[in-house]
Amino acid sequence: MARERREIKRIESAAARQVTFSKRRRGLFKKAEELSVLCDADVALIVFSSTGKLSHFASSSMNEIIDKYNTHSNNLGKAEQPSLDLNLEHSKYAHLNEQLAEASLRLRQMRGEELEGLSIDELQQLEKNLEAGLHRVMLTKDQQFMEQISELQRKSSQLAEENMQLRNQVSQISPAEKQVVDTENFVTEGQSSESVMTALHSGSSQSQDNDDGSDVSLKLGLPCGAWK
């Protein structure tokens, strides 16, 4: 005949509770000892009765098992902290992915893509955004044009000023210096200084010959009476 299954609930009688506690405590400690022997496990049991009486069992040293438990609990807490950090990073990553997807969608809509699901208000807002963006582009373009024009005007003024300075320097050169400058220019155009001096000497000789010829012609032109 099968034993009737007893309902697990608090025993109301204090005496019956104490008897049941004593019997089941011995059975619990026996099972713990068997588990430690069969499985080579460190087992520790600490039990307080309803009256506050302490009962304990340890397969080895209770203090050693408790120290091992505390060490394991501390290490477990440290190991769980990176897991929490990893969950936080994963949450941030998911949030950034959502923001990236929204920004990509807005960019495609700015290009005129994927507009089918937008309402009239959303389309009007998109139109305003496009107009504002176009206005900023035009302002930036005009600003760059003005900067380029100002730079060209500055360079033109600088060249004009340098040209004026050169003109002033040339106007201050004396005629003799101008002749030297012209001679130097003549030399640089392909003739040596010796050829220049030869040309100048031949010119002076021709001038002297012309003067002598003039004297002869004048002497020949005198009347015969003047010779006496």
UniProtKB/Swiss-Prot annotation:
Expressed in palea and stamen primordia. Expressed in shoots and coleoptiles. It holds the Pfam family K-box. GO terms for cellular component: nucleus. SMART domains: MADS. Residues 1-61 form the MADS-box domain. Residues 189-217 are annotated as: Disordered. Keywords: Developmental protein, Differentiation, DNA-binding, Flowering, Nucleus, Transcription, Transcription regulation. It is found in: Nucleus. Its main location: nucleus. InterPro entries: MADS-box/MEF2_TF, MEF2-like_N, TF_Kbox, TF_MADSbox, TF_MADSbox_sf. Disruption phenotype: No visible phenotype under normal growth conditions. Residues 86-176 form the K-box domain. The keyword Transcription regulation applies. One of its GO terms (molecular function) is DNA-binding transcription factor activity, RNA polymerase II-specific. One of its GO terms (biological process) is cell differentiation. It comes from the Eukaryota. PANTHER family: SERUM RESPONSE FACTOR HOMOLOG. Plants over-expressing MADS22 produce shortened panicles and stems. Probable transcription factor. May be required for spikelet (rice flower) development. Transcription factor that functions to support the MADS55 in its function as negative regulator of brassinosteroid signaling. This is MADS-box transcription factor 22.
